[in-house]
A protein has these predicted regions:
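A short helix-turn-beta junction within AAA+ P-loop NTPase domains corresponding to the substrate/partner-engaging
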Residues: 335-368
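Conserved NTP phosphate-binding and transfer environment spanning the P-loop NTPase/kinase superfamily
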Residues: 359-487
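Peripheral, non-AAA+ core regions of ATP-driven protein-machinery
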Residues: 492-683
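Conserved ASCE/P-loop NTPase catalytic core
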Residues: 203-333, 338-342, 356, 474-489
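Substrate-engagement module of ASCE P-loop NTPases
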Residues: 301-317, 344-354, 387-393, 599-600, ...
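Dynamic helix-loop-helix/coil hinge segments at AAA+ ATPase domain boundaries and subdomain interfaces
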Residues: 179-213, 541-545, 624-627
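Extended, charged/polar low-complexity intrinsically disordered regions
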Residues: 2-200
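Short glycine-/polar-rich loops that comprise or flank the Walker A/P-loop
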Residues: 227, 277, 317-319, 354-359, ...
Length: 683
């Protein structure tokens, strides 16, 4: 790359980042250039690139790149060149040879032996002090810079002649959280999101906000203790990339494991993975079919409380659990024919109690397959520096941040609230590590967190358990009292009637025409400052307009009695009716208008999935519905769970089929005020 090309590639954010975090950033296209020729993790490459290429000067970068390539050529051992490497150490006769390799340690008969992966020797002498300093050497191993010497061992008669003189894990020596937080404060939230994505190797300019948030959610297990994440989606979307490549503190398992490996030996002499690593991830979860049931049983307790029983004493760990897997069907097919945990193996899928402990279901089908334009050529943090930041943030707690501005809805039970709080906390650490967040920014995190937990609960509900039926998840603004319901995108649009409550002032209503045709409408009232006038949209006409006018006249005549005189006199009411079936049925919907107006005036939503039937006279007398069977059948088919019915129609309810009665609960009313109170769930 020429100097001119380099200057074109840089943007304002690159310059701002290199100034704020000098020496801790690297150009990500360099990583890909080196990665092509070296089969080492990204954090290893960036350790070297950060050491030799942390500059904005193109000539310095090119010189540093040459040093990195030379270092990898000289010091990185290819698996098929182990004999050459061993011979080189032997020829030095006591002097050390430096190389990069993954080092594991095991205890054999009270003596520690190191195993160097590509050096291909399982009995290398190592000081116990390194084992004490870096206990990950005992489980999974650590990529390190190793100084190796050859020394004839009299006891083994030359059998084990290799000794590690010095071992340096590939990671930064120290991390300053205050410096990191101060640096973060110099950037806007949008800028920081883009920086984190570039650090991961992605180009944010080709992503919308939601896709950015999905990518960032993959980092939560690295930043939040005891966080349980699942992501299922198409192949080649980089599901396990964050765990595998972005941190030396995460372990990725590609097959079944044992209780001893996960949670430690019964004797207590060797710790399990959950006590050693920050994240334990399972790739290709479908391959876990043969995993012992005991592992899931122990994980169930661990995922709930972070504790587990091995031997006589209970033990604890703070590793997060992540599960990644592939979907084999389009998402709409999965939603319509089953549930979203079907790709899981039986040992997990059939354990609803375990699934209920998952904090977030990341919709992997929304993430595109990796393509060239998704990768960045701009600057991001050196990965080992960013990994240390996320690791240091694990000690901090942001779970109470939500309470500054919001409360969670009644359908979120204790486990749901815990999941949402942990997701918000994790996203705070990734995006707002300095703790400064506006109400609008926090609202975005809360909504995103609620959605991911609701996706878990919706699947549990589909699996057929009555205890999970409350899934209308919401959160409320403490200042305004406004309640917002959060859905899951993949389930939208199947029923005309939403399962969540509508905004205050909106209701569903139905009618049956003289020819037996049934109509289904969503009536929406918006209040603005005014003088007590009714303003009807152009689509509202004929019988419907007349019934609305009668209901408004009745409401106006009773405004003082209802305690709403001032609010009605100082407001104008804008009315719109959305024909959900587009069949233009003449509708008498006076009671629905009255309830909608009452809802708007009280700033209180009507109970979810409620249909309001009936009309009224100018004096407030209720008119019965021509027939119940047809509108209730249509209502049931489109997701209605509850119907307000004039008490005059009570005798007709005996004609309604048992199927409808099983799915739609009737609520009878005798006057408009009673209808409004019952619709709003008020006494």
């Amino acid at each position: 790359m020429t100097s001119e090309e380099s200057s074109i590639a840089q943007d304002g954010l690159d310059q701002k980042l290199t100034q704020a975090f000098d020496g801790k950033v690297v150009r990500k296209d360099l990583v890909r250039k080196v990665k092509v020729g070296a089969n080492v993790p990204v954090f290893v490459l960036e350790f070297l690139l950060g050491k030799y290429c942390a500059s904005s000067d193109e000539m310095a970068i090119q010189m540093g790149l040459k040093v990195v390539n030379d270092t990898l050529a000289e010091n990185y051992i290819r698996p098929d060149e182990f004999m050459k490497a061993q011979s080189k150490v032997e020829q030095l006769q006591g002097a050390t040879h430096t190389f990069i390799d993954k080092v594991k340690v095991r205890l054999v008969d009270s003596e520690y032996w190191a195993e160097c992966n590509n050096f291909n020797h399982k009995f290398v002498h190592i000081s116990p002090q390194y084992v004490r300093d870096y206990d990950r050497l005992l489980t999974g191993g650590v990529w390190s810079q190793v100084d190796m010497r050859f020394e004839y061992d009299e006891e083994s008669k030359g059998k084990n002649p290799f000794w590690i003189s010095k071992l340096q894990p590939i990671q930064i020596a120290s991390f300053d959280m205050d410096e990191y937080r101060t640096g973060r404060a110099a950037f806007s939230s949008d800028e920081w999101v883009d920086i984190v994505l570039r650090t991961m190797g992605y180009e944010p300019d080709v992503m919308d906000r939601r896709l950015k948030m999905l990518f960032l959610t993959r980092l939560i297990p690295l930043a939040e203790r005891n966080y349980n994440l699942v992501e299922l989606g198409p192949r080649e979307t980089g599901k396990s990339y964050a765990v595998q490549e972005l941190s030396p503190y995460a372990a990725l398992l590609t097959g079944p494991t044992t209780v001893a490996n996960m949670f430690g030996h019964m004797s207590g002499k060797q710790k399990g993975m959950v006590a050693i690593w920050d994240v334990v991830a399972f790739d290709e979860v479908a391959d876990l079919q043969k995993m012992p049931k005991e592992v899931i049983t122990t994980m169930k307790t661990y995922c709930e409380s972070g504790t587990f029983q091995r031997g006589k004493e209970a033990d604890t760990g703070d590793a997060s659990i992540a599960m990644f897997g592939n979907t084999n069907q389009p998402i709409d097919v999965m939603v319509q024919r089953g549930h979203l945990f079907e790709p899981m193996p039986d040992v997990i899928r059939d354990d609803m109690a375990f699934i209920d402990r998952l904090h977030y279901y990341l919709p992997g089908w929304e993430i595109p397959k990796m393509r060239p334009d998704l990768f960045t050529s701009h600057y991001g943090f050196v990965v080992d520096y960013f990994a240390e930041a996320l690791r240091a943030l694990r000690k901090h707690n942001f779970t109470e941040t939500l309470d500054k501005h919001f409360t969670l809805g009644s359908h979120l039970k204790t486990r749901d609230q815990k999941a949402v709080r942990k997701t918000v906390s994790g996203l705070m650490k990734v995006i707002y590590p300095h703790g400064e967040v506006t109400k609008e920014e926090l609202g975005e995190l809360v909504e995103f967190a609620v959605e991911g937990r609701r996706r878990v609960k919706e699947q549990l509900k589909k699996m057929g358990s009555f205890e999970y039926y409350q899934t209308s998840f919401s959160y409320s603004d403490k200042e305004t009292g406004e309640e917002k319901f959060v859905g899951v995108p993949e389930q939208g649009g199947r029923d005309l009637v939403a399962t969540d409550p509508l905004a205050p002032g909106s209701v569903y209503t139905g009618t049956i025409g003289a020819d037996g045709t049934v109509g289904l409408y969503r009536l929406e009232i918006t209040m603005t400052t005014g003088t007590g006038k009714l303003k009807v949209a152009g689509g509202v006409r004929g019988t419907m307009k007349e019934s609305i006018s009668r209901a408004f006249s009745y409401l106006s005549s009773k405004k003082v009695e209802f305690g709403m005189g001032k609010d009605i006199d100082n407001s104008d009411f804008h009315v719109e009716a959305i024909d959900l079936l587009n069949n233009g049925v003449e509708a008498e919907i006076g009671v629905a208008f009255f309830v909608a107006a009452f809802s708007a005036l009280r700033h209180t939503p009507v109970t979810a999935a409620t249909l309001i039937l009936g009309d009224l006279s100018i004096q407030g007398n209720i008119k019965e519905v021509r027939s119940l069977t047809e509108p209730l059948q249509l209502a049931m088919d489109n997701g209605v769970k509850r119907a307000l019915v004039p008490i005059e129609n009570k005798r007709q309810f005996l004609e309604v089929s048992g199927d409808i009665m099983e799915h739609v609960d009737p609520v009878f009313y005798g006057d408009p005020k009673a209808a409004a109170f019952k619709a709003l769930g008020m006494n």
